Amino acid sequence: MSQLDLNALNELPKVDRVLALAEINAQLETLSAEERVAWALENLPGEYVLSSSFGIQAAVSLHLVNQIRPDIPVILTDTGYLFPETYQFIDELTDKLKLNLKVYRAGESPAWQEARYGKLWEQGVEGIEKYNDINKVEPMNRALKELKAQTWFAGLRREQSGSRAHLPVLATQRGVFKVLPIIDWDNRTVYQYLQKHGLKYHPLWDQGYLSVGDTHTTRKWEPGMAEEETRFFGLKRECGLHEG
């Protein structure tokens, strides 16, 4: 399928897009993560971007994509409520991997948001969704627009949650192509990649955190908990960036 044909997929209804992409995804499932990135760079339109929350396994996709496409813009949506260890991890990986980091934030500061709306994350699912819209979704939409992105790489994996269990390698979202090169990797493959390339997990991994987001909606894993329960009080798994 030519690049022009792929562009035309964006004009189709969602169901038709999924059906049209099914054959391509069947082929992509047989490729390695590195081959998927190379295929996308050859067959999908630029500009290209990579998003990262700089979470537990973030070093994998940051290293993998940046090795193949040096200087690719790396989008971080900073809520202002990340753990101190996350900000330190961002600095460490940006320096080590020479990342072209692009930080986007909400138009309202965290203090201003609390003054206007209260602590949205304490206001149930509706409050959490509003918080995510302000601090994650709008900044990401702005980033994609300002960077003129047409192809978006992300480091999601099916093993991470039920909401990600059936995601394809290639899809369309927010009017761009979205590529998930390590979507089928398990925890062992992640560990092996980190070891092979001298990379580290997020610092909070050693303290029992399986997933890391904002300080107020992230919980340390305890025996008997599902990974989904460590984020957003178990009410949600996704922050909104990878939905829709």
From Swiss-Prot:
One function term, GO molecular function aspect: phosphoadenylyl-sulfate reductase (thioredoxin) activity
InterPro entries linked to this entry: PAPS/APS_Rdtase, PAPS_reduct_dom, PAPS_reductase_CysH, Rossmann-like_a/b/a_fold
Record-listed E.C. numbers: 1.8.4.8
Biological processes annotated in GO: hydrogen sulfide biosynthetic process; sulfate assimilation, phosphoadenylyl sulfate reduction by phosphoadenylyl-sulfate reductase (thioredoxin)
Gene3D superfamilies, per the entry: HUPs
Pathway in which this enzyme or protein is active: Sulfur metabolism; hydrogen sulfide biosynthesis; sulfite from sulfate: step 3/3
Residues at the catalytic site: C239 (nucleophile)
Enzyme's top EC category: oxidoreductase
CDD domains named in the record: PAPS_reductase (cd23945)
Compartment(s) of residence: Cytoplasm
Its biological purpose: Catalyzes the formation of sulfite from phosphoadenosine 5'-phosphosulfate (PAPS) using thioredoxin as an electron donor.
Family from the record: Belongs to the PAPS reductase family. CysH subfamily.
Name of the protein in its database record: Phosphoadenosine 5'-phosphosulfate reductase
